Amino acid sequence: MMRVLIVTAVFTFFLVLTSSGHDEDNEQRNILEGMFLDRAIETPKGLEEKRACGILHDNCVYVPAQNPCCRGLQCRYGKCLVQVGR
């Protein structure tokens, strides 16, 4: 509940700053946008993190002696698929 109130207050403050048309205010708005807007929009944790290996049906490029797919999977037909014989 407290998090919602903080996000609402920051968003309201951001709207007040963006409503004015002065050049100095535009500079302040750009700074605040970089600081607060990213925090107000929540994304699932780790969404943008790159995985070390491909999961089932991820795209992959086959390179001999390297397996870009996670354990138990292999790169076939440009996708990470279950290993043959499993």
Swiss-Prot record:
Signal peptide coordinates: 1-21
This protein's UniProt keywords: Amidation, Cleavage on pair of basic residues, Disulfide bond, Knottin, Secreted, Signal, Toxin
Superkingdom assignment: Eukaryota
Tissue: Expressed by the venom gland.
Residue ranges the record marks as coiled coil: none
Residue stretch(es) of the prosequence: 22-49
Disulfide bonds: 53-70, 60-75, 69-80
Protein name: U1-theraphotoxin-Pc1a
Species whose genome carries this gene: Psalmopoeus cambridgei (Trinidad chevron tarantula)
